[in-house]
């Protein structure tokens, strides 16, 4: 099996734009509400919920922590809805995404999300399941429920993608 090393990139709105939204206050539209006592950072992610009897779910995932090296042997995507991951413990995590190439993930990229950043994967975006760093961490997840199966998985058969370090290049 061929091993390809992935290089970690900083998570920025511009770099992540083809895959979804970076959820953070930096650069967001600020609105004062509640008689000026609360700052609202407005419209941070494009939440999608399509299909029969579709609705938005809010869950908490508790992710086990990973240490390098991390082998990426599969990816997943959600054809009927977006999926957002917002860290609740202020800890970093890795975000692995890929372009679609004829129904298969291709050209993988990995980003380091700081504990004050979340991500929202758009519908049909290939991504790896949660990769918490440092220690077990909780994440608020905004997801989609509905009649249709909203999970498609792909397992690599000829290449393992490896993250050698958890620090950006």
Swiss-Prot record:
Keywords recorded for this protein, A-Z: Lyase, Purine metabolism
Pathway, per record: Nitrogen metabolism; (S)-allantoin degradation
The keyword Iron-sulfur is annotated on this UniProt entry: no
Enzyme class: lyase
Annotated GO biological process: allantoin catabolic process; purine nucleobase catabolic process
Disulfide bond annotation, renumbered to this chain: none
GO molecular function: ureidoglycolate hydrolase activity; ureidoglycolate lyase activity
Catalytic activity of the protein: (S)-ureidoglycolate = urea + glyoxylate
InterPro entries: RmlC_Cupin_sf, UAH_cupin, Ureidogly_lyase, Ureidogly_lyase_bac, Ureidoglycolate_lyase_dom_sf
EC number from the UniProt entry: 4.3.2.3
Cofactor(s) this protein cannot do without: Ni(2+)
Superkingdom to which the source organism belongs: Bacteria
Assembly and binders: Homodimer.
Function: Catalyzes the catabolism of the allantoin degradation intermediate (S)-ureidoglycolate, generating urea and glyoxylate. Involved in the utilization of allantoin as nitrogen source.
Similarity comment: Belongs to the ureidoglycolate lyase family.
HAMAP family in UniProt: Ureidogly_lyase (MF_00616)
Name by which UniProt lists this protein: Ureidoglycolate lyase
Gene it is expressed from: allA
């Amino acid at each position: 099996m061929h091993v390809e090393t992935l290089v970690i990139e900083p998570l920025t709105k511009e770099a992540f734009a083809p895959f979804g939204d970076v959820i953070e206050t930096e650069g967001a539209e600020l609105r004062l509400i509640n008689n000026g006592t609360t700052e609202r950072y407005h419209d941070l992610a494009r939440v999608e919920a399509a299909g029969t009897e579709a609705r938005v779910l809010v869950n908490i995932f508790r992710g086990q922590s990973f240490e390098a090296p991390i082998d990426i042997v599969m990816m997943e995507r959600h054809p009927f809805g977006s999926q957002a991951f917002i860290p609740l413990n202020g800890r970093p995590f890795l975000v692995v995404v890929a372009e679609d190439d004829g129904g298969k993930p291709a050209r993988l990229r990995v980003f380091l999300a700081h504990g004050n950043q979340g991500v929202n994967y758009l519908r049909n975006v290939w991504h790896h399941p949660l990769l918490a760093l440092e220690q077990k961490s909780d994440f608020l997840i905004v997801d989609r429920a509905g009649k249709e199966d909203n999970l498609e998985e792909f397992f690599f058969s000829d290449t393992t993608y490896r993250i050698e370090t958890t620090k950006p290049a």
